[in-house]
Structure formats: structure tokens, C-alpha cells
């Protein structure tokens, strides 16, 4: 079984984590949901790639062709295009890039909010809800179709 699949299966066991940066608008706060997700990436053998500041055009090119991603296999980039842009992580395994965005909602909110207004079809969303104290995953394309 691939490391990315094992990671995603363990994500489904995560409880609710609040995304403090999104909730407060202050990006210097600890974003616990992202931290918990990053901890799982590390537990499953992915290593942080030091290269940051990936241009949005590069991200978009990789999104169109996930096999063109140039970061090393078995690595991930956190906040590749900055804290105010998605995704939260680009993960590469077996030559393919995966785009992972963390979303959380409190009791007051019933649905996740998307920076662009709509989910991105090539993204994997890690969604946690306080009301249910559970996490689920879905593809952006599932919402758009």
C-alpha cells in the first residue's frame, strides 16, 4: 500500500482540530489542523522539502499535470504558495504530486469556506467538523461534479 494512501487512511481517524489561522485571520497563530496533518505526513515517511515560495503558475502547471512536479519523491512542501493561498501541502509520491488542503468548521459554521470561492478539482480536502469531532476527506472534483 502506498504511503499516501496509508496517510489518508490515518487522516480519517483524526478528531476535530480548529484551524486557528483561518478562524482569527492572524497567520502567526498556530494552525493546529495543519500541524496535525503535517505530523501524519512525517509519521508516514514523508520529509519536508525545504524549497518554499513556489510560484502560483508553477503550482497551476503541476495541478494540470501532477507528474510534472519537480520536488523529490517522498517529500512535501508546506504552504507552497504562502499562508493565504491553497493548498496547505504539495506531497509527491511515485512521481505524482498530491495537493492537500485542510478545512475545519466550528459549531456555528455548516460548510467549509474556500479561498477561491469554490473547491479546486485537483485537490484532496481534509475536512474536520467540531460538531461531529471527526475528519473526512474528499476530492474537490467530487463537489464540483
Predicted regions mapped to residue ranges:
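Conserved catalytic cores of phosphodiester-cleaving nucleases, focusing on short active-site segments
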Residues: 89-91, 98-104
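Interdomain/boundary linker segments immediately adjacent to catalytic/signaling cores
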Residues: 1-75
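Short, surface-exposed basic-aromatic patches at helix termini and helix-loop junctions that form
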Residues: 40-46, 91-94, 114-120
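Short beta-strand-loop-alpha-helix junction that forms the active-site gateway
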Residues: 102-112
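Short, mixed charged/polar active-site loops
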Residues: 97-99, 134-135
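Short, flexible loop/turn elements at secondary-structure junctions
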Residues: 93, 104-106, 129
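Acidic, metal/cofactor-coordinating or nucleic-acid-engaging core segments within structured domains
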Residues: 116-145
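Beta-rich catalytic cores
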Residues: 85
Amino acid at each position: 500500500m502506498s504511503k499516501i494512501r496509508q496517510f489518508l487512511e490515518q487522516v480519517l481517524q483524526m478528531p476535530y482540530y480548529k484551524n486557528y489561522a483561518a478562524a482569527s485571520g492572524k497567520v502567526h497563530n498556530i494552525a493546529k489542523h495543519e500541524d496535525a496533518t503535517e505530523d501524519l505526513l512525517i509519521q508516514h515517511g514523508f520529509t519536508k522539502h525545504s524549497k518554499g515560495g513556489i510560484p502560483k503558475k508553477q503550482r497551476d502547471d503541476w495541478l494540470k499535470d501532477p507528474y510534472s512536479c519537480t520536488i523529490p519523491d517522498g517529500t512535501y512542501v508546506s504552504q507552497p504558495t504562502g499562508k493565504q493561498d491553497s493548498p496547505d501541502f504539495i506531497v509527491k509520491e511515485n512521481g505524482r504530486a498530491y495537493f492537500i488542503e485542510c478545512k475545519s468548521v466550528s459549531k456555528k459554521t455548516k460548510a467549509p469556506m474556500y479561498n477561491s470561492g469554490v473547491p479546486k478539482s485537483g485537490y484532496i480536502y481534509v475536512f474536520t467538523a467540531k460538531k461531529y469531532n471527526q475528519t473526512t476527506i474528499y476530492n474537490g472534483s467530487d463537489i464540483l461534479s
